[in-house]
Structure formats: C-alpha cells, structure tokens
C-alpha cells in the first residue's frame, strides 16, 4: 500500500516493458481538483470503511533468501510457475566456492592462483550454514548417528588401551605410571561410553566428550613415548597414526578442529621423538619420514572428512528442499485450484478436471461442457459515460478504477446471490439461479441492480463526472458452460441471454425488466411502462414488453429493513473478528501424509497448524523438519529397510535406485590415492636404500595411477577430450560397479608400492651370521652378542653375505602398509562390506608375507638391532650370558594386532558413512515420492490455469510475495488485435426440441472455436494470445509481452494477419464438411493497449484501449468473408508485401469516417 494525500491507495503492480513506457507513464492530472474520478478519494470511497494503517514494514529476509534462495521470478520476466531450486548453501562448501571467489573483490578472478589457493583453503575450513538455526537443525539431523558412532569409538578405544597394555606388560616388567595411565584412560572411555548411551545426552555434550577424548589420546601418546623401551623415533608410529585418523573420521568434530587436532597430535609425537632421541645417529632421517607419514595421514583424514561432510550437508539440504517443496506444493496447488474455481464454477471445473485426468480416447467431437438451467434471471449492466471517464485516467488508473468498481460489483453479486458471468469492457453481466436454482432469482437481480445504481451514484457524487448505470434484466432459460480448448471463460447462451443483452437499452439510473421478470417479482416492486422498443430495434422486432422499476412495495421495504437489521446485528457481533473484505489469499496448509508419517510425523502435527500459519515459509519448513528429526528413529529405519550386516536395502527396487547414485567426486578419490602413493614413495626413498627395481616399480605404478586419475577427471571437463575418452570416463564414474572396481584397483596399486620394496632388501638372518662368527647356535644369539660384533641399527651396507642392501627400519613398511589401507577409506562410494573384504585380503597377504615369506627376516633382524640400539643408548655393557631380555613384543607379532585395530576402525567408519548415506537416501526418497506426486498435480493444475489466464498473469496471482491488493496491469506499446465473428451464427442458432434446445448448435460452435484454438496453438502462432470469445466472436492479440513482441521486425503483427487468413480457410473447410454457409467477418487493428486483470475475487484477463475499440469496429463494419484492417496496419503489411486493397471510407461509430483496407493474401512465396 502507498500513502497519497493522506488516503489509502491500492498498490498497482506496474508491468512496464520496453515497448510500453510511453503508454504506462502517468500523465499529469488536469487541474487541481482532488475529486476527480481517478483520485485516491474515489478509490477509498469504494472500499469498506476502515481506519488508515501505517505501511507494514518489509519482513526481514532470512539467510535462505539471499544468494542461497532463488526467489520466484515475477510476471513479465518470462518465468514459468513451478518449483525453484533451493540452494541452502553453507559458508565453505564446494557449491559456494565460486560465489566466495566472486565476492572476494574484482582482483580475484576464477582460475587465478589466488582463486585456487582460496578454494584450497576452503577445504580446511569448518562447514557451517549461514543460518544458526539451520546449523542447529543439521546437527540435530545427524545427532543420533554421531551418538552411535561415538559410542562405538569408545569401545574401540577401550580395546586399544587393552592392546597397548598387553604390548607393554607382556615382554618385561611394566612401568607402573604407564599402566596406571592406560587403566585410567580405559576407565574414562568406559564412563564416556555409558554417558553417550544415555537418553539425556545432548549435542553440546558431544563436543565436550570429543575434546575430552582428544585430551586422553594426547596423554596416552605422551605416556607411550616416555615408556618405550628401547627408544627410537620410529618405535610405535602406528599409535599416533591411528589417533590422527580417528580424529578425522570417528570423532564428530568440525573440520578446523580436526585439522588442528590432527596436526597437534602429529607435532606432539615429533617433538617427543626429537627430545627423547637426540643422540640417535639417524634421528633426522626418521623424523623426516615421520613427518611425511603424519602429513599423509592428515591428508587422508581431510580427503575423507571433507567429502563425507559435504555429502551429508548436501543430503540434508536436499531433504530439506524436498520437504519445503512438499509443504509448499499443497499451498500452491490449493491456490491454483482456488484461482481455477474463481474463474469457473465448481461443477464445471471439476467435470473438466475429471475428464483431463481420465484421458478419454479421442472422439469425433470435442466434449462440450454445457448445462441447461431453466428459471433464471440475467442482468446486463453498462456504465454510461465510461468513455469520458477513461479519458481522464492513465493506464494504471484505468485498471485501478475498473478493478475497484467491478470488485465492488462482485461483492454485491455475492451478497445478492448472483453469479458474475463476464466483464466486457464496461459491461457487467451476471445471472441468479445458477448453479443452484433459486425461487427468488428475479428479486436477487433487481436488488443487484439497485445496489449497482447506488454504487455508481456515490461515484458520481464524489467525482463530479456524469456517470450512471443502465441495467436490464430478463428471466428465462440459459445454457451455461465453456467453449473451446484454450482460455476458458464461463459464459451463458440462449435467446433469453440475447434478449437480456438488448435490455441494456434503458434509461440511465433505472432498472429495465421484461414481463417475464415482472411475473417472478410477485408484485413486490412498483413498475411503470419501459417502452424499450422505442430505444432498441431488437426489442421492437420481438415485440418485447418492458417495464421500469419505480421502487419496492411497502411489504418489500419492510422485509428489506428486517434483513438489514439482522445483518447489522450479525456484523456487530463479529466486529473485530472478521477482517475487512479483500481477495482471498490465505489457504490452510496440509502437511501430513503417508510418507511423512513413515518419517516420524503423524496427524498430531495438525494441532500446531494454527501456530504454523503465522510463521514465514522458511521458518515453517525448519519447524516441520525439526519435529521430523526429533520423531524419527534411526534404529527403526534401519530395522525396517536395511539389512543389518550387509547394509543393503531389503527391497530390490530401493537397492537398484541407490546403486544408480553417481558420486561426482570419484576423480578426487583417485587423485587422493595418487597423493598417498607419492607420500609412500618419498618415505621409502628417504628411509630405505634405493634400487633400480624399486624405482621401476614406483614409476610404473605412478603412470597407472596418473592415467586412472586423468581418465576419471575427464568426466568433469569432458568437452576438452576425445569422445571415446569421455565415454570411458562416464562409464566409470556413472556406474557404481565400475567405479568400485577402479577404486579397488587404485588401492591395490598403492598397497603394492607399500610392500614391493621389502623384496629388494637383504633377507639374510643376522642370527645366522653372528652364530657362525661366534661359533654358537643361532638360538643363543642375543643383542649383547651383536653389540660385541659392532652391529648397529641404521647401516645400509649388508651386515652378512649378499649384495642386497639392509632395510633397517621396517616400522615404515608397517606404516606405509597402514597408509595404503587408510587410502581405501577415501573411496566413500565403496560399500562397507566391500571395504572389509578388501582390507581382509590385503591384510592376509601382508601377514603371509610377514610371517612366512622372506621379508620376515627383515623384522627379526630389526628386533635384534633395536635391542643393540637400546644397549648403546643406556651406555651399559653386558656379556652374552647376562644380557637383558627384550623390552618389547616383536614387531612381526605386533603387526597382526595393529592390523586388526585399524581394520576395525576402517570398518566402523565405512559402516557409518554407508549407513548415513543410505538413511539419507531413504529419507530423501520418501520426501521425493510425495513431492513428485504433488508436482504432477501442480503441473496438471497449471495446465488448467494456463487455459484460463496467460502464464505471466497466472504467475502473478500465484506468487507468494504478491500482496492482497496488488493489481496486474501492463502497458503495451504496439499490439495487434483481432476480432473474428461468425456473422450469420445468430440465424443458425435456434432452440428446438430436435436440437436439445440449442445445445447442438452450441456443440458446432464449440467445434469451430476448438479448431481456432488448435490453430493458435501451432508454433508459428506462438506470439498470439487468445483473449476470449464473446458469443460467436473470437478475440486474439499479439505482442502482449516481451517474449512475443517484435519491435524491429513486427513479426507479431504479420503472425496475426496470417492467423486471420488461416481462420478464413478453416471456416471454408468447416462449411464444406458441416454443410453450412457460415460467413466470417474479421477486423484487425494495431496500436497501444492496456492489458490487465479485472476482478479481485474472480480475475479476468482483458485488454482495453482505443486500439481494441477500433479493432472491434473493423469487425462490426466489415464485409462477410473479408478481413478489414486499418490504415496503420495496412502500412505495416504493405511493407511486408501482403496483398491488400482499399475499401474506401467507412463510417465508424465514435470515430467518424475512416479509410479501411481488405487483406486478400500473404506476400508472394
């Protein structure tokens, strides 16, 4: 609403276009008089009295309405009705990286180095929705899963402390401090597991538990480093690697916290290794290898955490989007149906919808939706002096004026039990007695006429302009319904309707009735002779006796006074409860459905509906989603739909749908595997001696992985590569089976690189060499014997016979093998059971090689040399007899247990990822199914609506942002208008029992109009818009919006001319096959018009202006079987080489004499 001169004026939704600025621009008012017809004073006088209220403040935009929420385009922008994508957007996602780069300033260009660094930095940032409320919803959404995951992690950590305690206590006397630390850690883990399983456990507590766990892990790591015996920078590397990995994958913390924690644990171990092993000769080599090992573990953690969280957030926002659509679609469908029923009576609309829905087979004739009603009264009312009124208004004010006046008439019609049929320019006609019969139909029409005259008298007093109403009423029989296939409008036909139309020829301010109507009034009104035949030739020819209403009889006045008193009493009792009359826009929302009940929502949601209607749409969706999250049971969903161990869906169709899911990040997974391979290569090149075989194996594996990465990357940038390569890439990425095979192949290559170098090392047992030198049995050799022979840890030269180099630090073989297993966790699309099988096979191969193969001697030699290293560090000297026992479990016996712990963690993470993905898929699928059903209904309703209103007009009336009192109006600079009438149809139409009282005549008219509608639907006539039919007259126009207006080529004008000629040809074809002799008269004109919608409760699209009037005159003054055009149109068509001839000067009502032309044909082909 806007304030002008202190009075309330309805806001007009101006649709000014490039071709309509001049016509849409307001002209200055004449004089300074404020009582003009188009002034705000007149507008307020037509409204119900109410105190002025301030303009409501615009509601605050929630974060979803920024870049993230794509608002529905308004009319005039070429937008279609329908769902819009909802990109919920969190601050640091892949989807927002481009936005973030673009928003960084003009110096940040896509593809630049700075942009690439910015995108890389976003990977390390915590993901968070812009809306704090939405972020809380997301955390609640995954809370149950995170709670379950955290509980299982506590169990794994209890197992880990038991393993560490066994490794520490088994070989020698344990250190009490370290044992106490592990016991405390285990006790805390058990306590935390109990806490996590409590129903009172909350989201905030989860963060606390996570950070407590990190603190315990750091303490255990420090204790393990201090308790190690013997000490070495490479001893116990697997433990911090495990801690770093579970920090990223099994602890429910944000990315930034995970990165800091992972790097913190890694740095802590490096510092401890440096401080505790300062005298080690090979300290820096091992610290460098340790740093690479930890850095690779952090990279794997990031490559696992980032896509998993992004996928979860995208699944959440997609689910929310589907729920939002599911909640909003019923509203939109209800709005569409309400709009449909505001244009067509319910009985007609429902019958048409049922026929469309059942998709009946083609019939020889189109079905006609006509009903016959006897004993009705028809009122035609015309505004006298409207032309002079319109000349004082701008285009905007004209639509505003008509809307306010006819909206008042619509309200009066509803109060007087009349059904408005149509608005034709300034003519308003309605019927009482349909669709439900009424005995007092004549009284209702007379009272309607009295109210209309009172309303226009008020306008006359306020404006000072001589306007009045001419009202004519006749009672009889009508056929009502719709004709044609497009732009349906409810209408009535019959001889009685024709007669009622001519009854308009009355004195201004009087109600003109026929004797048939008078008979139904039962003497309740005083009348006088109307002498209608003196003013209308049709009435004279038909010998119609007419009367003028003088006033109500005394009895009728008393009845009306009593009714008015009852209405006032009722209105006073409802005062303050009922709002002022405005077009209906509020619709109740239906949220419960079968699928939603499956998701945890039942009919109890209806109890909160009243509160929900007060929420804005975004808050309503969040409120509903919050209830759904609280109500759903993860365990129940798993039990009902997912197999327990395999995590496959119980239903085959669901499993097939899930298997068709495409993971677009698969190329990134393979790239991460390549990165892990590079780290393994660097570690082994740094720690172990080089060999030609080793370098050859690494080069081959690198080439294979690089080819795999490039092949998968083609999927994302396919246009740059050959078609065959693109096809191969698509076949890998889009197929879950193919991508799984490629993923397993990549992990096998990385695993091969981790173990291949073991076969190039020296496999001679040191015990055998030393025993031979000392002349003792190999079983008697101890670390003290090796110390006496000056054997030490870290020498690359062969210690015994042979030329193969010595691999002194097999801990890194174990570490590299663990990295290769961790690389499998990056491939999120591989099923948990598939990963478990792969880990089992790879672990079994490694253990067989370790325990039974030649590489086992490398680990035996390492254990002995590590003992020598410990003796050297202690500076104590022992002989071979009293040499102390080894202070640790042999590495090759520790490795199977380490593998078991890692395999358990990897499997739990795989289960968590797959379970989350499948439950998200299931929830989204349930919401999608209902959404698709609603979309089908929406598209179905939309097709019906577009058969009533143009698309942009329907979009305007269905827009959620539209205000109740907004009008639709559009100024169009150059529009071609056509009126095509069947000149002699009135002679053909007769009402006889043989033709079902005229229904068969209307059936033929329906076929004719349907043919015209089918022609206008052709692609070549896409610039044309059917406006309406008026009896047997067909009205169309072209160039009414930006998509159909051709300013330069004027193709929309020639299209209408071609259409007019097609109608002439079609009429000849109809005459040949129906054995009739219908004659068409067609009139064409061009110029500016005002297009808009009149009627608030029952919107009716129409166009107004001098252009329309002249076009109608071209039809009425035309010649049968000819197309008459104006001079303006002649100039355009002649320039296009159309064939025209001059008719000469024609007298046109209201315009004087005009030179017109006949259109004979199109341009030469």
UniProtKB/Swiss-Prot annotation:
One of its GO terms (cellular component) is cilium. Residues 757-816 are extracellular. It is an enzyme of class 4 (lyase). Mg(2+) 1 binds at residues 382, 426. Phosphorylation by RAF1 increases enzyme activity. Phosphorylation by PKA on Ser-659 inhibits the GNAS-mediated increase in catalytic activity. Phosphorylation by PKC on Ser-553, Ser-659 and Thr-916 inhibits catalytic activity. Its main location: membrane. Mg(2+) 2 binds at residues 382-383, 426. PANTHER family: ADENYLATE CYCLASE TYPE 1, ADENYLATE CYCLASE TYPE 6. The protein contains two modules with six transmembrane helices each; both are required for catalytic activity. Isolated N-terminal or C-terminal guanylate cyclase domains have no catalytic activity, but when they are brought together, enzyme activity is restored. The active site is at the interface of the two domains. Both contribute substrate-binding residues, but the catalytic metal ions are bound exclusively via the N-terminal guanylate cyclase domain. This is Adenylate cyclase type 6. It comes from Canis lupus familiaris (Dog).
């Amino acid at each position: 609403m806007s304030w002008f001169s202190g009075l309330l004026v309805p806001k007009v939704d101006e649709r000014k276009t490039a071709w309509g600025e001049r016509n849409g621009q307001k002209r200055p008012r004449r004089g300074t008089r404020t009582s003009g017809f188009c002034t705000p004073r007149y507008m307020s006088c037509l409204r119900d009295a109410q105190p002025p209220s301030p303009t409501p403040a615009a509601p605050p935009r929630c974060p979803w309405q920024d870049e993230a929420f794509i608002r529905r385009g308004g009319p005039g922008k070429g937008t279609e009705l329908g769902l819009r994508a909802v990109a919920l957007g969190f601050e640091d996602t892949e989807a927002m990286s481009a936005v973030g780069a673009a928003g960084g300033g003009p110096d940040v260009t896509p593809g630049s180095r700075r942009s690439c660094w910015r995108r890389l930095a976003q990977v390390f940032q915590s993901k968070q929705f812009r809306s704090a409320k939405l972020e809380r919803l997301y955390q609640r959404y995954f809370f149950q899963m995170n709670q379950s995951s955290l509980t299982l992690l506590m169990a794994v950590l209890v197992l880990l402390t038991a393993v560490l305690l066994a490794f520490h206590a088994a070989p020698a006397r344990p250190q009490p401090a370290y044992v106490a630390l592990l016991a405390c850690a285990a006790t805390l883990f058990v306590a935390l597991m109990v806490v996590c399983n409590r129903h009172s456990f909350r989201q905030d507590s989860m963060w606390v538990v996570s950070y407590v766990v990190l603190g315990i892990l750091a303490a255990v790591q420090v204790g393990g480093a201090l308790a190690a015996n013997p000490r070495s920078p490479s001893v116990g590397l697997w433990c911090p690697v495990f801690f770093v990995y579970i920090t990223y994958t099994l602890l429910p913390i944000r990315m930034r916290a995970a990165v800091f924690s992972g790097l913190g644990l890694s740095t802590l171990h490096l510092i401890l290794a440096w401080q505790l092993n300062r005298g080690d000769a090979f300290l820096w080599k091992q610290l460098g290898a340790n740093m690479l090992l930890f850095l690779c573990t952090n990279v794997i953690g990031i490559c696992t955490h980032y896509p998993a969280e992004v996928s979860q957030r995208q699944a959440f926002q997609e689910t929310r989007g589907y729920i939002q659509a599911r909640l909003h679609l019923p509203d939109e469908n209800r709005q569409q149906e309400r709009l449909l029923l505001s244009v067509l009576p319910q009985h007609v609309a429902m019958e048409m919808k049922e026929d469309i829905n059942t998709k009946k087979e083609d019939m020889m004739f189109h079905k006609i939706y006509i009903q016959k009603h006897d004993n009705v009264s028809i009122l035609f009312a015309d505004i006298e002096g409207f032309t002079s009124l319109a000349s004082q208004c701008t285009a905007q004010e004209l639509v505003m004026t008509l809307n306010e006046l006819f909206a008042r008439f619509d309200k009066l019609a509803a109060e007087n039990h009349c059904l408005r049929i149509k608005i034709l320019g300034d003519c308003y006609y309605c019927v009482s007695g349909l669709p439900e019969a009424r005995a007092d139909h004549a009284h209702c029409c007379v009272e309607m006429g009295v109210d209309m005259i009172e309303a226009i008298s008020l306008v006359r007093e306020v404006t000072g302009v001589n306007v009045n109403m001419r009202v004519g009423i006749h009672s009889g029989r009508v056929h009502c319904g719709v004709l044609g296939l497009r732009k349906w409008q409810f209408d009535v036909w019959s001889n009685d309707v024709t007669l009622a139309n001519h009854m308009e020829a009355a004195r201004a301010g009087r109600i003109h009735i026929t004797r048939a109507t008078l008979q139904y009034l039962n003497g309740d009104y005083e009348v006088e002779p109307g002498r209608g035949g003196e003013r209308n030739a049709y009435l004279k020819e038909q010998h119609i006796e007419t009367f003028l209403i003088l006033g109500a009889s005394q009895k009728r006045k008393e009845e009306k006074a009593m009714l008015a008193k009852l209405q006032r009493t009722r209105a006073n009792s409802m005062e303050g409860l009922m709002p002022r009359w405005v077009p209906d826009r509020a619709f109740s929302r239906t949220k419960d459905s079968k699928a939603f009940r499956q998701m945890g929502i039942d009919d109890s949601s209806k109890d909160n509906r009243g509160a929900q209607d007060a929420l804005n749409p975004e808050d309503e969706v969040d409120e509903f989603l919050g209830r759904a999250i609280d109500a759903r049971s993860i365990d129940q969903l798993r039990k009902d739909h997912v197999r327990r161990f395999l995590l496959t869906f119980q239903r085959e169709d669901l499993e097939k749908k899930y298997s068709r899911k495409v993971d677009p990040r698969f190329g990134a997974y393979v790239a991460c595997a390549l990165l892990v391979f590079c780290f393994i290569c660097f570690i082994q090149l740094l720690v172990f001696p080089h060999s030609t075989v080793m370098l050859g194996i690494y080069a081959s594996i690198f080439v294979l992985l690089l080819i795999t990465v490039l092949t998968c990357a083609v999927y994302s940038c396919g246009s740059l590569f050959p078609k065959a390569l693109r096809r191969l890439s698509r076949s890998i990425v889009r197929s879950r089976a193919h991508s799984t095979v490629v993923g397993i192949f990549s992990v096998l290559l990385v695993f091969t690189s981790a173990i291949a170098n073991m076969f190039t090392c020296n496999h001679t047992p040191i015990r055998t060499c030393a025993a031979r030198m000392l002349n003792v049995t190999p079983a008697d050799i101890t670390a003290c014997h090796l110390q006496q022979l000056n054997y030490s840890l870290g020498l690359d030269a062969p210690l015994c016979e042979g030329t193969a180099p010595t691999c002194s630090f097999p801990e890194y073989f174990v570490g590299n093998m663990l990295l290769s297993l961790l690389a499998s966790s990056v491939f999120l699309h591989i099923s948990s059971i598939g990963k478990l099988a792969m880990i089992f096979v790879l672990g079994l191969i490694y253990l067989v090689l370790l325990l039974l193969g030649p590489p086992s001697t490398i680990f035996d030699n390492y254990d002995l040399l590590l003992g020598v290293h410990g003796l050297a560090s202690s500076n104590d000297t022992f002989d071979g007899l009293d040499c102390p026992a080894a202070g640790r479990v042999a590495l090759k016996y520790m490795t199977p247990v380490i593998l078991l712990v890692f395999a358990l963690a990897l499997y739990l993470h795989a289960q968590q990822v797959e379970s989350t993905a499948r439950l998200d898929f299931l929830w989204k699928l349930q919401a999608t199914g209902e959404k698709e059903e609603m979309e089908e209904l929406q598209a179905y309703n939309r097709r019906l609506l577009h058969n009533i209103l143009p698309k942009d007009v329907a979009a305007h009336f269905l827009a959620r942002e539209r205000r109740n009192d907004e009008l639709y109006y559009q100024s169009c600079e150059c529009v071609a208008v056509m009126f095509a009438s069947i000149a002699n149809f009135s002679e053909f139409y007769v009402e006889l029992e043989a033709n079902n009282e005229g229904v068969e005549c209307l059936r033929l008219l329906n076929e004719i109009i349907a043919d015209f509608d089918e022609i206008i639907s052709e692609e070549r006539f896409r610039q044309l818009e059917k406006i309406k039919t008026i009896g047997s007259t067909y009205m169309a126009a072209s160039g009414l919006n930006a998509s159909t207006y051709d300013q330069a080529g004027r193709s929309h004008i020639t299209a209408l001319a071609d259409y007019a000629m097609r109608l002439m040809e079609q009429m000849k074809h109809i005459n040949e096959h129906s054995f009739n002799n219908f004659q068409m008269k067609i009139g064409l004109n061009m110029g500016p018009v005002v297009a808009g919608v009149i009627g608030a409760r029952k919107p009716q699209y129409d166009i107004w202006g001098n252009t329309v009037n002249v076009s109608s005159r071209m039809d009425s003054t035309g010649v049968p079987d000819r197309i008459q055009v104006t001079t303006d149109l002649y100039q355009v068509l002649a320039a296009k080489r159309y064939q025209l001839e001059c008719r000469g000067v024609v007298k046109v009502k209201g315009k004087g004499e005009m030179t017109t032309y006949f259109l004979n044909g199109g341009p030469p082909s």
